[in-house]
Structure formats: C-alpha cells, structure tokens
Amino acid sequence: MFSNGTRANPVIFTSENDVTNAPGDRTDAISEWGGLVILGRAPINRCRDAATPGTVACENIVEGVTNPDALYGGATADDNSGSITYTRVQFAGFAINTQGNELNGITFAGVGSGTNVEFVQVHNNSDDGVEFFGYGGDFGEVVHDGNFVMDGLVFSDGTPSPALHEFKQVVA
C-alpha cells in the first residue's frame, strides 16, 4: 500500500457521499465505508493453525473475514507493506457480521518494520481508529479524532512494539 501525500496536499480516503456531496449527504457521518486493511508478512503470536508463532507457517485471517486468501503473518520481521504518509481516512468503519467483528479506519495486520507510517489521521470513524494485529514497525504520528464509538488506537494481539512503550511514556 502506497499512499504518500504531502503536508500541503494530503491523500484523503473518504466515502462517495463526501466526494459527490450527493442529496442526503451526511457530512461528517460515520460508517460510510469499510476502511483500509493492510496485510503483511511480519511475525505474529496468534496462529490460525497449530503453527509456531513467528514462523512462516504462523498466519491468521483478520477478524470477521471469511476469504481464506486474506492472510497475514509469517517470519519477515522487516516486512515492507508500503508507505502511508500525510494521509487521512475519514467516515469509515462498520460491523461486518453479527459476531461483533468490525472494520476500522485502518487495520494493520502482520505489518513489519519496513513499513513506513507517518502523519496519518483517522477522522470520524465508527469503530477503532487504528487497530494492530501483530505490528513490528514505528507507527509514527497518528491522530484519532471523532472516534467516539470505540477507541482511537488499539493493539489487539502480538508483543507490544517499542513504539507502544514510547506512546505510553508520552501519555503517562
């Protein structure tokens, strides 16, 4: 995934209603589209099968997704799943089934240290702003505003990355 805007011209992922200003447009509405899901090959600790965490065989499927090809995880700690800089995701996130699974503004799953994420904003999202399922990179500057239904930043599983400890130090 490559989404590289600039400070003056950020990349904006939004809903069709927001772009077209269609009749009935609910400006600043939430749940108008699913959000971004980035699947990488970095080590995870929750394997779908009886595999050893951190090995190539240790893979999983993002919660609620039924496509068996939508796998993340592996053994590439420096996995490069792209670059997302100066990017805003807005009006995303929604429940995808009745078991409580939902899509977030951005879901990073098995994304490694080779992935660059800087100056990202998730605005008016219906679920978590950003959720991590095994993330080994530096998540940079991430802003979560208008994400009042759930949380802004969530690490679902995996060993906390150094960036999480840095985030904790800033907040504490």
Predicted regions and their residues:
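Beta-strand/loop edge motif enriched in small/polar residues
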Residues: 1-172
